[in-house]
UniProtKB/Swiss-Prot annotation:
Protein name: WAP four-disulfide core domain protein 1
Gene source species: Homo sapiens
Function: Has growth inhibitory activity.
Disordered: annotated segments: 46-70, 199-220
A single GO molecular function term of this UniProt record: serine-type endopeptidase inhibitor activity
Amino acid sequence: MPLTGVGPGSCRRQIIRALCLLLLLLHAGSAKNIWKRALPARLAEKSRAEEAGAPGGPRQPRADRCPPPPRTLPPGACQAARCQADSECPRHRRCCYNGCAYACLEAVPPPPVLDWLVQPKPRWLGGNGWLLDGPEEVLQAEACSTTEDGAEPLLCPSGYECHILSPGDVAEGIPNRGQCVKQRRQADGRILRHKLYKEYPEGDSKNVAEPGRGQQKHFQ
């Protein structure tokens, strides 16, 4: 039997198929790159559409930056230019309800951040010693001491006094320790001392509050 060889036509068909496959792969890669480049824009458009809400549907105002709705209809409220999203308004305005329709209104500034002062807890010292109710205002992490051990005591700023939290031990050379608190005044103008730590001969100790002026002292 004669051998059947591969003719020129068969080779051309294989080359054409290979070229077609290569073109398909290049087209698929190009389409993938185009889709990746277009995806962020599509997501941004979707976000804006969701913010604006459905066409003709109700849209709730942003309560955090919108002024409260007026109780009475302001003049010209229904004739104001309407909006559907904050992006349609100038920089310092928000799309809010003006009593008749959604329009660009002045944004309300966010509420201020309050830095609450620390309220110390009363602490029992053991035996007959205790601390009275803590002061109303305390400087955050402001330590102080009234013990004079040859050096200047760690005093508080003007208008504050040292509220003793730990009496220390003079015999052991341990100074007392406290926190700076704002001074309170009585009706007659005298400063109310938050606490004076007293020790009695029989060994008992207690803390008392009494009016007076000047720095706190350690009584023997």
